Each structure stands twice: as C-alpha cells, then as structure tokens.
Amino acid sequence: MTLKRIFCAALALIVLQSVASAVDYCRLSCPEGRDHVGCRNAGFGAHCGSNPQTPKLHQEHIKMVLQKTNWLRGVVAEGSFCYPKAARMPVLVWDDDLANLASLHTKGCVTETNKCRSTERFHSPGQSSYEISGDTLPSAMDILNFALRDWYLQKDNLTRKDIGSYPAGEDKGLKNMANLISDKVTAIGCGLTHWEEGKLKRALFTCNFSSSNVPGHPIYQRGDNFATKCAKTHPYYKSLCNSDEHIKPNNNV
C-alpha cells in the first residue's frame, strides 16, 4: 500500500471516530456556580449584532483541522522547537459532542466565558478561541487556518519548563499551544459563527479539546525517544500513538 493510501485510510478513520449523541446537558456535572453552555441554549447571544450565522463545518474543514493539529503534535513529539520528545502523545480524532458545544459557545459571540463545557465522556475540556473582524471576512477555511496558525505561534511563549509543569496564574499567551500538544487530549471539535456590527463583520472560531491542562501537571510526558510508551503507533503519524490508545482524559479532574 502506498504512503498516500495509508494516509487517506488513516485520516478517514480519524474523521469517522466522531461521536454523535443527544445529551441533556442540564444534567451534566459542572463546577459550582457555572452554567453549562449546552443547557437551554438554542439561539444567538446578545452580543451577536445583526445577521448572525453558524455555518456547518464540512468534511474538508474537519480534515484540515485534523491534519494541521496532528502534524503539529507529530513534530512536537519528535522534539521540534527544542521541546522534549513525547513518550505517549495520541493522534487526535474529531468528536461531535465537543464540536456541538464549541458551536454553541461561538453563538454567544464572546471569546471568553466562564461556562461549563463538559460532555458525558470528557469532564473538563480545554478550549481555544480566535476572533477576526474587518470590512469583509475570509472564507471559513481561511479563518480556520488563521486560527490554527495563531495558536501555533504561541510556541514562542511556551518553554521546556512549561512542558514539565503547566504554569499557574495569568495566561501568558501559551494556553492555545498547550491545548494543541497535551498528551491527555485525544479528541477535538470546533465551531464557527459570524455576525455583523454596523459595517464591521466579525467571526468567532472555537475548538474544544477533550482534556484541559492543569497547573503543576506536565503538558505531556517526556521520553528518551518519541512514542516509546504507545501500545501501537499511528500508521502515518509515526511519532504519535494510534487513535485507539487507552488514554484517560479525566485523570486530572
């Protein structure tokens, strides 16, 4: 089998491993004082100006997000950017519950909120958001690319020390990169909303990650070489564990 066919087959499996469910989010456990973003949330928020829309992310968008994030995880696992090699970093798959909650978040048209975003499988998801505005907006594909690049560039703020112990306190422009390369994260799901404010057009893109980084805990476990603790490596992203690696995303909760 050619490398191209292996990649296409592996990517198809990653995309197909999404999880669709009809969940009553009002019943899910949330930290005290925090409302769930999915509880009784059926419309756009008060900050959405005029003509808000939440376009569906199609397979080409999902594939691009998975390709970019797994490429980044792969090169980080190999020790790029002077980071330590990752012993057990899994390849990411798409999760429909995380994507649905990300879409609901963007419908609030506010980048940061304190709302809970837990799912039945993932109790404390991480989140990254990107907002763009202008007289016109780029295509959805371009917005997604801009967001991923913006988060990736936070590598300049994330140090080897941070990898070993995620820093507490105020975010120093590294949270989004840390979300992308956490070895507790096994799944990702994203959403996009755009709206108008007078002549200005705005868009908010958000991705939810299956686990969040905890201060004082490592972002990922380092190893003498990459993938040394994987039960099986991915057929294309050879420095990452396969998608069926048994990772417990809620251990830090």
UniProtKB/Swiss-Prot annotation:
What is the role of this chain?
Inhibits platelet aggregation induced by all agonists tested (ADP, arachidonic acid, the thromboxane A2 analog U46619, thrombin, and snake venom snaclecs (TMVA that activates platelet through GPIB, and stejnulxin that specifically acts through GPVI (GP6))). May act by competing with fibrinogen for binding to glycoprotein IIb/IIIa (ITGA2B/ITGB3).
The record's Pfam families line, in alphabetical order, gives:
CAP (PF00188)
Please classify the protein's predominant subcellular localization into one broad category.
Answer: secreted
Query: What tissues has this protein been observed in?
Result: Expressed in salivary glands.
Domain SCP: start-end pairs: 66-209
Q: Can you name the source organism?
A: Tabanus yao (Horsefly)
**What is the name of this protein?**
Tabinhibitin 3
Motif Cell attachment site is found at: 222-224
